[in-house]
Amino acid sequence: MGKGRIFQAAKVYQRASEAAATNIVSGLPPRNPPLWLKAIESIPPAEINTRPYPIQHSPPNPRARKPRNLFRPTKIVYPEDELRRDFYRDHPWELARPRMIIELDGKDARFLDWSKGLRQRGIPLSGESVVQRQLWLMENQGMTKQEAYDKARHEFYKLRQLEQMERRIAVEEARMVGGYFGKDLLTVGMELENKTYESWKKWATTEIARQESARASMYTNVVDNSALEESEEDELLAQN
């Protein structure tokens, strides 16, 4: 037995049937098929040790003269991948929003109905809602990719505006009854940035002063030997 997997295990029945139906010596009656041939016909061998041809997710290339990577699994591509890539390319800041990816039993998608819009029970609004809504519009209402994207995107913008208005009104109502809110994340980030800038400015001023003093001391330490060289030349001329 050769190394690796057995490639011909799935063709045992076909080969045995062909061998039984073929006469090696002409003139003799056909050979009796083996007893196990009927059993293997009804119960084929398992393909645990075989290497089946993987499912192709893309049409074959007619220009290819010789098939390559015949037994290599192809890339798994879903229709949502391209829609998701387009949305987050146009809305990169949506990736900065916190996401909740915890599910109860992994089958939460059964309770979602994208025909009713982007708001779904138990799922916060996110870019994935736009992707699933766009896919539903393309498959069920016959819209093109761009038409479904525009419709889902406008619905998403309206819901985001409503969320911002609700949040702003809630803050105003809380302040009306004496609520106090600390610094938001933007203010804290600006303060940290200003603090870092002032620290860098102080260091840069000190560093510039140090470099200027080093440059000035470099010129003051240079000894002028031109007068000494001229006197030596005069002595040599006098001796000659």
Curated annotation (Swiss-Prot):
Q: What exactly does this protein do?
A: Component of the mitochondrial ribosome (mitoribosome), a dedicated translation machinery responsible for the synthesis of mitochondrial genome-encoded proteins, including at least some of the essential transmembrane subunits of the mitochondrial respiratory chain. The mitoribosomes are attached to the mitochondrial inner membrane and translation products are cotranslationally integrated into the membrane.
Q: Name one GO cellular component term.
A: mitochondrial small ribosomal subunit
- Where it mainly occurs, coarsely classed, is mitochondrion
Pfam families for this protein: MRP-S25
The name of this protein is: Small ribosomal subunit protein mS23
GO molecular function ontology, one term from the record: structural constituent of ribosome
Assembly: Component of the mitochondrial small ribosomal subunit (mt-SSU). Mature N.crassa 74S mitochondrial ribosomes consist of a small (37S) and a large (54S) subunit. The 37S small subunit contains a 16S ribosomal RNA (16S mt-rRNA) and 32 different proteins. The 54S large subunit contains a 23S rRNA (23S mt-rRNA) and 42 different proteins.
User: Into which family does the record put it?
Assistant: Belongs to the mitochondrion-specific ribosomal protein mS23 family.
KW Mitochondrion (keyword) present? yes
KW Lyase (keyword) present: no
Q: Which domain of life is it from?
A: Eukaryota
- Tell me where the transmembrane regions lie: none
Q: Which compartments is it annotated to reside in?
A: Mitochondrion
Alphabetic keyword roster: Mitochondrion, Ribonucleoprotein, Ribosomal protein
**Which species is listed as the source?**
Neurospora crassa (strain ATCC 24698 / 74-OR23-1A / CBS 708.71 / DSM 1257 / FGSC 987)
